[in-house]
Every structure is written in C-alpha cells, then in structure tokens.
Amino acid sequence: RQAEMAALQNALDAGELPLRVTHNDTKLNNVLFDAKTRKALCIIDLDTVMPGSALYDYGDSIRFGAATAAEDERELDKMEMSLERFRVFTRGYVRACPGLTQKELELLPLGAKVMTMECGVRFLTDHIDGDNYFSIHREGQNLDRAHTQFKLVTDMERKWDKMKEIVNEEVQNAKENGSCCI
C-alpha cells in the first residue's frame, strides 16, 4: 500500500498526469441543488481548491458516494463499496470529462483507493491529536471514521479486478458514443 499511496503524486511530479484545478472535497453535500428541478446549481466549500490530479476528486467522490454506510458507522460489516454505484459514477464521470488522458483513465480505481486510505489516515491522525480538525459529535467519532475508511479500502482491494473491468467497460462505451478521452 505504501507505494500506491505515493503513486499519484509521483505521476504528477513526473509529468505523467496533468495538473488540474481540483476541489479536493467532492462529496454530495458540497453541491447545491435547485429545489424544483433537482439539478446541480453550483459547488460550495471552495477553501480546498488547488492544483492537483482529477483522480483526487474522482477518488474522493467514490469514497463518499459508493460507500454503503455512513462515514462514521460503528458496525463495520455494513461498510463496503457498491460496485453498482461505482459503475454509475464512473460512467457519468468519463462521459462528462472528455479531456481525461489515457493515464488518468487507467488510474481511476487507484484514485478511489488512495483517497479513501488518505482520508482514513487523516481521521486516525485527528483522533490521535485530540479531534482538532474534523468536527465530532461524539467521543471516538474520528476513530470510527478511520475504521470505516480502512474497511472500504479492504473491500476495494477485494473488488479490484472488477473495478478495473468496470472502468475499462465504461471508457470503451464512452469512446463508442464519442464522449470520452484525449
């Protein structure tokens, strides 16, 4: 896992991945929706915007959106990564982002894994440091968050081949529809 954690930054540093504007907190509650049309209006919480990899935003979205349980769920057997949600999000993402490079497309699953592991480490670090960064509403909440993220990483590893297969299928479908890729 150690090599994987550095892989995206190493690829950016080597020029293998393009530097893009990234939000870095791409979860659903950072999107405002129109109450009538239910269409997205804008993205909020812009304090985390900076240069980075599109894989950071994709990965964080998968971490949050494909999880089958709340981020602070205490019953870890409820937490896994939904392959159905992974597929639907990936389909939308590759079709909405036609400028993604082949290397970015190949690394989409790794983006999900890296961002999930990173969040787990951040939650654990915050718990150890006295819960100063992430707000908590109960004792041990950040530790529970760390546990769920690590469980999610383990589930991604178990489903790794299927994740790569889904990305390949969705990229191929998007290419056939003329809505994908450099």
Where are the regions a protein language model picked out?
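All-alpha amphipathic helical-bundle segments outside canonical DNA-binding/catalytic cores
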Residues: 100-112
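ATP-dependent phospho-/nucleotidyl transfer catalytic cores
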Residues: 1-23, 28-42, 135-143, 151-154, ...
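Active-site activation/catalytic loop segments of kinase-like enzymes and analogous catalytic loops
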Residues: 55-99, 114-133
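Secondary-structure capping and boundary motifs in well-ordered enzyme cores
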Residues: 18, 23, 50, 81, ...
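Active-site capping/gating regions of soluble enzymes
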Residues: 26-28, 33, 85, 105-108
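Long, compositionally biased intrinsically disordered regions
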Residues: 156-160
